[in-house]
Amino acid sequence: RQGRLSMTSIWLNGVAYGWPQRPVVVVCIDGGDPAYIEQGLRDGILPNVARFVRDGFHAVADGVVPSFTCPNNMSIVTGAPPAVHGISGNYYLDAVSGDAVVMTGPELLRSRTILAAFADAGAKVVSITAKDKLRRQLGKDLDLGRGNVSFSSEHADRCTLAENGIENVLELVGMPLPDMYSMELSLFVLAAGVRL
């Protein structure tokens, strides 16, 4: 039932995903203990997250092992574990060359993504992430010619319609290109999401 469409859902990796009745925004907060967010909510310093919790949906996802960005994010976006999607870590050892190879190429992702499945079924999909290495996997098989968008704040100054489905992102967001290792890199993602 891979990628099958029904009137109310899509199927991917043996899971049915209901067709949303209104636009859906997914924010993945990666790399932090949920206790930090919970404390911020108690302290009242995260009003927008509090609104997500109150008016929408929130969950703490079970992490995969090893606990690295690439395998966890690909598990979220494919709805499947590393044994299915193929991204088992941030690097793998090439048996022929003996080199460590970073696992960020979309060709290494063995599963379709939920994003591409919904886009193929007619939904308009926007994928924005901080770092471009992740953007390439998140945007795998996403048809940018049909109004879908996939870009990173890291390369927001380089976006083209052909590669990202959007251009002039810095102008749209109204912020300068953030430094790669700054908190503004993630803030840019959220600001871009609001503008789109």
What name fits each language-model region?
Residues 3-57:
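Active-site-proximal N-terminal segment of extracellular/periplasmic enzymes that hydrolyze or transfer
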Residues 5, 35, 43, 47, ...:
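Generic alpha-helical secondary structure signal
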Residues 16-18, 50, 66-67, 115-120, ...:
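A general structural signal for short secondary-structure junctions and capping/turn motifs
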Residues 29, 63, 127-131:
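Glycine-rich, histidine-containing beta strand-loop boundary motifs that form or position
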Residues 31-35, 54-60, 69-72, 90-103:
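Glycine-/proline-rich flexible loop or hinge segments
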Residues 32, 44-47, 68-72, 82-83, ...:
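Generic alpha-helix structural propensity
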Residues 37-79, 124-126:
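Short, structured active-site-proximal loop/turn typified by the sulfatase FGly-forming signature C/S-X-P-X-R
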Residues 79-196:
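His/Asp/Glu-rich, glycine-adjacent segments
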